[in-house]
Amino acid sequence: MGSCGGKHTGKGAPKPYSRNFTDPWRKTPGRLFGTALIRFYQITLSSLIGNSCRHLPTCSEYAYEAIARHGLWRGGWMGFFRVVRCGPFGTHGFDPVPRELSPDLKWYMPWRYWRCSASRTGK
């Protein structure tokens, strides 16, 4: 009689925990580069800075998901503006990445990504 060793198999097996976006996404070179930079930050510098983010998901988790969902250009701007909003006089609370972006968010107008969040777009 064999021992299962505490490992689950089959459909009822729990997914391993990941702090980052785990849904399937297109693995383009830009997205891979951007998410690798975010992951490098999470592994190295994030532990030195400490848990100081005022949002959920954290700013690095938000940037990772934004880049994975919307690409390096759009997701990078969304992540940048999220970090800017995280300051002492900025926003706080639950602020997820929108599943879809509004058609009026053009690539050549990155300042419009300033207030881009799922709570504002309703998606």
Curated annotation (Swiss-Prot):
Topology within the bilayer: Peripheral membrane protein
- The principal location of this protein is membrane
Gene Ontology CC terms: plasma membrane
For the region Disordered, what residue ranges are annotated? 1-23
Q: Which InterPro entries match?
A: Membr_insert_effic_factor_YidD
* Entry annotated with the keyword Membrane: yes
Record's subcellular location: Cell inner membrane
> Which Pfam family, any one of them, does this sequence belong to?
YidD
Highest rank taxon of the organism: Bacteria
Keywords assigned: Cell inner membrane, Cell membrane, Membrane
Q: Describe its function.
A: Could be involved in insertion of integral membrane proteins into the membrane.
Instruction: Provide the family line.
Output: Belongs to the UPF0161 family.
What protein name does the entry list? Putative membrane protein insertion efficiency factor
